[in-house]
């Protein structure tokens, strides 16, 4: 197995059915000045259902057992934002969304991969969206619902769309979003489980639980054809021809669509 950068400027579009993935803003982490100062911001990714459902019913709080699961699946019928970047990137985020024809009020679900300010600093732009931040899920208005997310117990949002517990970097409550069925195979939006492609020299120093994060990294690499890391361009996961294909993986050779070009859905 090896990895290689998926080249292209933001926004980078990977068409899919039933969900397409748009990397709106590529994260970065760059040394600044002397000492250990770093200027950084997290990647921001949009997951778009091919067919959008009505945007009203997800705002109502479901009753009874299975409420969180039903509410999550309902919220996933509209645009899903994975991380929001830091508050200093507010205008860049709004501009990137507008470039996709999405207003803040159109977003029905925001997933925060972990609780660091460079990843969830713009939650206030989306008061009408359901929020899944780390392991906390709430509906608009602050109604929190219990759910079964845990290591080895994913939350299903829709066909080929899941949230996984991927602990390590920020502690025990980090999550990743797994999108199967794209033109490039399975895309995993991994937050800071991966800082960037080729981060083997640095990720452990930034991890609250390196052992847990190592397990999370291995789990992601088993299924991913493309990884969207927290602070760098997306990268491909390339397997030897003799390796068995994993569920959702196809290692498609189709290239993503970059910039303002229209994706050709297949």
UniProtKB/Swiss-Prot annotation:
MF terms from GO for this chain are: metal ion binding; RNA endonuclease activity
Effect upon mutating residue 231 to A: Loss of endoribonuclease activity
Residues binding Zn(2+) 2 are: 118-119, 192, 231
What EC number(s) would the UniProt record show? 3.1.27.-
Keyword field contains Zinc: yes
Q: Which residues form a coiled coil?
A: none
Cofactor(s) essential for the protein = Zn(2+)
> Could you say which enzyme class this protein belongs to?
hydrolase
**Highest taxon, organism lineage:** Eukaryota
> Is Phosphoprotein set as a keyword in this record?
no
Q: Identify one Gene Ontology CC term for this UniProt entry.
A: nucleus
Reaction catalyzed = a ribonucleotidyl-ribonucleotide-RNA + H2O = a 3'-end ribonucleotide-RNA + a 5'-end 5'-phospho-ribonucleoside-RNA + H(+)
Disordered as annotated region, ranges: 48-71, 229-266
One of this protein's Pfam families, by short name?
A: Lactamase_B
Per UniProt, which keywords does this protein have?
Answer: Cytoplasm, Hydrolase, Metal-binding, Nucleus, Zinc
Give the location in the cell. Answer: Cytoplasm, Cytosol; Nucleus
Q: Which Gene3D superfamilies match?
A: Ribonuclease Z/Hydroxyacylglutathione hydrolase-like
Example GO biological process: positive regulation of G1/S transition of mitotic cell cycle
Q: How is the cofactor bound?
A: Binds 2 Zn(2+) ions per subunit.
Complex and partners: Homodimer.
Q: Can you tell me which family this protein belongs to?
A: Belongs to the metallo-beta-lactamase superfamily. Glyoxalase II family.
UniProt free text on domains: Contains four of the five characteristic MBL-fold metal-binding motifs, with two waters completing metal coordination.
Q: What is this protein called?
A: Metallo-beta-lactamase domain-containing protein 1
Source organism: Homo sapiens
Source organism phylogeny? Eukaryota, Metazoa, Chordata, Craniata, Vertebrata
